[in-house]
Each structure stands twice: as structure tokens, then as C-alpha cells.
Amino acid sequence: MVQEKIRIKLKAFDHKVLDQSVKQIIDTVKRSGGVIKGPIPLPTQRKVWCVLRSPHKFEQSREHFEMRIHKRLIDIENATPQTIEALMDISLPAGVDVEIKLS
């Protein structure tokens, strides 16, 4: 019997929406009989932009903008066809990027 392993990587700007999506995936996998490892929180990616507030005067006055990308990793082992079918039917909120790899 071939054991399938599914790796799901989730990314979002809002960590609350991301955690809700992870919980929804975990509940679905547990109901369909899959073995789950995770969620594993990956390092948060932080991007910062520095912008001048004034076009010509007061050059030392700057404003900083920041964007954070939160990530989670879920491994599903012993995935059955029912598990894969259930994962395909999940509707996740907008703003959550999902990457699925089968091995």
C-alpha cells in the first residue's frame, strides 16, 4: 500500500484568519480519518518601507510602513481518498494563500 503524505503551506497577512483556516483544515482531516502533524508556525516575514513625508523640506522626517506575512505548515500522513476529497471541498476565507504538495 502506498502511503501518501500531503504538505499544506498557508500564508496570510492576518494571523487570526490564518489560524481559523488551519483549524478548519485540521477538523476536516480528523473527520475523514487522516493523521495530522502540526500546525507548525513558520517564521513571520516582515517587509518595511521607508518613505519621505515631505517632498523637499524636512528630509529627516520619514514614515515607515510594514507588512507582515504569517505562515503555517501542516503535514497529513496516511491520507485516504476521502481526506483528499474533503480537502478539495473546503472553502477558505479570502486572503489565505494555500500551497499543497503531494509526496
From Swiss-Prot:
- Superkingdom, natural source: Bacteria
- One Gene Ontology cellular component: ribonucleoprotein complex
| Molecular function GO terms recorded | structural constituent of ribosome; tRNA binding
Q: Coiled-coil annotation: which residues?
A: none
| InterPro entries for this protein | Ribosomal_uS10, Ribosomal_uS10_CS, Ribosomal_uS10_dom, Ribosomal_uS10_dom_sf
The alphabetical list of record keywords is:
Ribonucleoprotein, Ribosomal protein
Q: Known Pfam families for this protein?
A: Ribosomal_S10
> Can you supply a Gene Ontology BP term from the record?
translation
Record PANTHER family? 30S RIBOSOMAL PROTEIN S10 FAMILY MEMBER
State how it assembles. Part of the 30S ribosomal subunit.
Report the family membership.
Answer: Belongs to the universal ribosomal protein uS10 family.
Protein function: Involved in the binding of tRNA to the ribosomes.
This chain belongs to the protein called: Small ribosomal subunit protein uS10
Please name the source species.
Persephonella marina (strain DSM 14350 / EX-H1)
